[in-house]
Amino acid sequence: MKKTTITLFVLTSVFHSGNVFSRQYNFDYGSLSLPPGENASFLSVETLPGNYVVDVYLNNQLKETTELYFKSMTQTLEPCLTKEKLIKYGIAIQELHGLQFDNEQCVLLEHSPLKYTYNAANQSLLLNAPSKILSPIDSEIADENIWDDGINAFLLNYRANYLHSKVGGEDSYFGQIQPGFNFGPWRLRNLSSWQNLSSEKKFESAYIYAERGLKKIKSKLTVGDKYTSADLFDSVPFRGFSLNKDESMIPFSQRTYYPTIRGIAKTNATVEVRQNGYLIYSTSVPPGQFEIGREQIADLGVGVGVLDVSIYEKNGQVQNYTVPYSTPVLSLPDGYSKYSVTIGRYREVNNDYIDPVFFEGTYIYGLPYGFTLFGGVQWVNIYNSYAIGASKDIGEYGALSFDWKTSVSKTDTSNENGHAYGIRYNKNIAQTNTEVSLASHYYYSKNYRTFSEAIHSSEHDEFYDKNKKSTTSMLLSQALGSLGSVNLSYNYDKYWKHEGKKSIIASYGKNLNGVSLSLSYTKSTSKISEENEDLFSFLLSVPLQKLTNHEMYATYQNSSSSKHDMNHDLGITGVAFNSQLTWQARGQIEDKSKNQKATFLNASWRGTYGEIGANYSHNEINRDIGMNVSGGVIAHSSGITFGQSISDTAALVEAKGVSGAKVLGLPGVRTDFRGYTISSYLTPYMNNFISIDPTTLPINTDIRQTDIQVVPTEGAIVKAVYKTSVGTNALIRITRTNGKPLALGTVLSLKNNDGVIQSTSIVGEDGQAYVSGLSGVQKLIASWGNKPSDTCTVFYSLPDKNKGQISFLNGVCK
């Protein structure tokens, strides 16, 4: 028999379905001169049923790379596509009338208008569908039939800070936990914090609530502690239940806005963010500019309104200012409605005030020609309020709304009536990359009060001295192209008896070839506390990669205040180990006292099981040492998994037996010793892809596909299961009982004890084949034809120890 040499690498590149780097090669099989029937399987490998990893295309658009079962049909293979798979690919199932299924719930494609072509050589499945059976294209929201409520699980986020000061030997602690439990569509959440500052201990529970989505009516039901909607009235904390339209389920919806908190710290400081008196966030910051972004605020369950920011300086000074957190103009498309209903008890952080039961309802409806009408009520035994308003989408000029409110505050002696009106304006200028948001509310009479003001004033007459007359806020964001960008935030509260308080935060940023420049200005005034201060900061960052071959930056920062304080700060910042390690070393000199010098060191590490950090500061009179740790824990049916902090919506990655595999896009996130990890920052109701880096797989492990698509509902912990092959990777030479090698093109199927095919490979020259995931307990079945007699079972033995990546074995097929 004449033989032609073909390398094993080429054969496995063409036919080994588990290889994600495969290429297509073409051969003249006639040149092999094989005996009749010996190469039958080789030349028609696509007719052999089994599990194959394929690229799935619908009308020439790649939908996913996944493992599918292909069943044998006449002269071809037919993929097993379930109804869920077709929905996932964008097929409108309701348009496929009389759809038929086999016993394995696979759609019988021959009875549908859906056509397919399977190409075994390049591992692709081409689906073609007429436009009439395609779902409407929506770049945001996935089909609700594949929304995944996730697994039942207990989850916990934790964060702890510790600081020790040598002077006085004081220790301070701050801890925060976010326990939760998922059961079906229900989400139970809590946020609690504990702090010990200068021997003063304090524990707070910001909220505890249960929540679920109602996809049929695109709404969200909440029971427990939450905040009311801020569309018409000020957001207030309550304990009760609410039903709200959930816009995250709506295509092209108006997404929730979260503010960015910016400020300037003059020393090592603690920043606390509160809303309605509740502590929702606390962190330590070094001197200079700081920014608390959307990522830190989004998962804390805050309500729309005003965020109170306090900066506690090391020298005892305290900065206080507010950050407006307002909603855009209430402008809805024609026929679209939005509502919220709340019944509960007002939840006051200070027990000195009353907490009455109240009802609040709001309704917004979009009309033709860009008009929107809205109205709402607040009812309580000591207070009633009514609101009506309208908005107009004025096209290229933005959107404008007007609302009118009336309130009745009930006292022991009389009812006090008041009125207020408000104007909001939003504009996004695409041509100039400008975003403007303005909001102004004027209390037409002194007796007008919001719900919160009525609660406070009913118990304390001195509240009248702080009765608001108006409140104005503005947000401006302007991109300047190559010149950088500018951000401006302004908030002014005026009172009937005094000027009130004002805060202005302005910043400018510019980046040129890696060199970044940042200017920041903060002004805060308060006639109530008689606090006035202006802070200015200048920051310059220069990359040092070309000099050090590492990701490092040199920074200079100058901070000054209207109280004649000026600091010069010089430092080096670095990132290493694929962004897992960040570190910083800085020195500071105070202009007021040339001898007042300080040194700051800090570093943080993001790993598989969480994040840990340490900081050190030193000057002539004090020395501080601090540590912080944070992370997340999920307890599920398969055990307990530790990881980095869990976002509101996340995935539990399962790759059994594969430890140390890296999840792409998340620094430090790798599978643990069992093959589990946590992948956060998923977007609810949308297609999310979770990818594992195949180059990080340990020796003698393999995964059938590297990308998994999930569509979680809000708050879900979805399971992303990777099919793994753990065991010896071997080059095995297989012979028949007569000593002759298996024929070229024979298909090897590795089956587990349940008969499920784990992997397939093709026999090459001289009966050799590459097989992955051998453990000695699976069945290795060889097949070379379509008749039942054209199979045999391969018997082999594994070495006791495998020091290399590939074992070389011999096997006999009987």
Swiss-Prot record:
It holds the Pfam family Usher. GO terms for biological process: pilus assembly. It is found in: Cell outer membrane. Disulfide bonds join 792-813. GO terms for cellular component: cell outer membrane. SUPFAM superfamilies: FimD N-terminal domain-like. Its main location: membrane. Belongs to the fimbrial export usher family. The keyword Transport applies. Residues 1-30 form the signal peptide. It comes from the Bacteria. Keywords: Cell outer membrane, Disulfide bond, Fimbrium biogenesis, Membrane, Signal, Transmembrane, Transmembrane beta strand, Transport. One of its GO terms (molecular function) is fimbrial usher porin activity. This is Outer membrane usher protein SefC.
